[in-house]
Amino acid sequence: MTKKKITKIVGYINDDIIDKYNLYEYKNRPIVQSLDLYVHIEKHIKDFKSVDSFNYTISNINEIIREPMFVYYEKDRKSLLYYKKLLDNVCVVVKLKLRENKDSYIASVYPVSEYKIQKMIEKSYLKD
């Protein structure tokens, strides 16, 4: 008997991001979070200011996806990096998948500095 992966839908790529990065094929496709996420972010837990900050960030992934401060597209990695200020400045990495039965998913979550966010914003202007 194969185990079914436990997931929940945490959001969708908004139209502004779809238009900015020409990601029309991802329109109306869900972004999911699975229990596997905790394995991937274990190494980042100690980077958060506090346990409360980590828990708050994980509990608000859907808000980060829905109302990011800034989003950067890494075309070569097929990833969207969602940045938002919560208790920490955080980055939520969404891996984009198009194959049938494969959802785009939360690949990582970690705190970042204000400096890092500004550098990514500058980098995005250079790409445009």
Kindly give the residue locations of the regions a language model identified.
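Ribonuclease/tRNase effector modules and their secretory precursors
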Residues: 1-128
